[in-house]
Curated annotation (Swiss-Prot):
Protein family: Belongs to the RNA methyltransferase TrmD family.
NCBIfam families for the chain: PRK00026.1 (NF000648), trmD (TIGR00088)
Subunit structure: Homodimer.
Species this protein is from: Bacillus licheniformis (strain ATCC 14580 / DSM 13 / JCM 2505 / CCUG 7422 / NBRC 12200 / NCIMB 9375 / NCTC 10341 / NRRL NRS-1264 / Gibson 46)
Reaction equation(s) it catalyzes: guanosine(37) in tRNA + S-adenosyl-L-methionine = N(1)-methylguanosine(37) in tRNA + S-adenosyl-L-homocysteine + H(+)
Matching InterPro entries: Alpha/beta_knot_MTases (IPR029028), tRNA_m1G_MeTrfase_C_sf (IPR023148), tRNA_m1G_MeTrfase_TrmD (IPR002649), tRNA_m1G_MTases_N (IPR029026), tRNA_MeTrfase_TRMD/TRM10 (IPR016009)
Gene this protein is translated from: trmD
Principal location listed in the UniProt entry: cytoplasm
Protein name in UniProt: tRNA (guanine-N(1)-)-methyltransferase
EC number: 2.1.1.228
Root EC class: transferase
Amino acid sequence: MKIDFLTLFPEMFEGVLGSSILQKAQDKDAVRFRVVNFRAYSDNKHQTVDDYPYGGGAGMVLKPQPVFDAVEKLTAEAGGSPRIILVCPQGERYTQQKAEELAREEHLMFICGHYEGYDERIREHLSTDEISIGDFVLTGGELPAMMIADSVVRLLPGVLGKEESHLEDSFSTGLLEHPHYTRPADYKGLKVPDVLTSGNHAKIKEWRRKESLRRTFLRRPDLLENYPLSEEERKWISEWKNR
């Protein structure tokens, strides 16, 4: 996979892309990152990338020319048709399902905005996706773009140590993930549930399923609205409601 980041602050990416899973993914040739300062594509001698909004108002707006030129040139160099992603508060709410969708692509290109926002022509005629990571506003799109890239890259084949690692993550099954424990079995009187040390894999599997459902019911009941509950799971929820 190829992932490009168009940004005015390329230095923000160095630590994240060069660490942990993202660095390992590059070492395994699973992904190739490219960070591009689109200021270099500005067509004026001062390399201006923003201007005052028509109609007045606070803040500055990113001009279309540098962004269009950068995207068109980088796309031509790479060949193909990348998913061109705007990260912005007005976009589609990001989910694990969207991460899985993007992980099937060959080329992603993130446009990281700053200032008051993008010229609307970028949104209407250049981007293929608009993504929001939540109902709040950040200074720029760099942090959300890195977060999305991380969630996508870890899904690529061979990146994680075990292929099933991401299959049990929160949201991958439609539920929050079950609790985890490690040694010691008794720490300051706080004990690991007996079932996890029993060696009975069928009971362990059932415990994890039940705890995953319980955690979702208590913390994110909205996720259960479209979740296909079994009859047994419905009984569990009924018991929890009556406590």
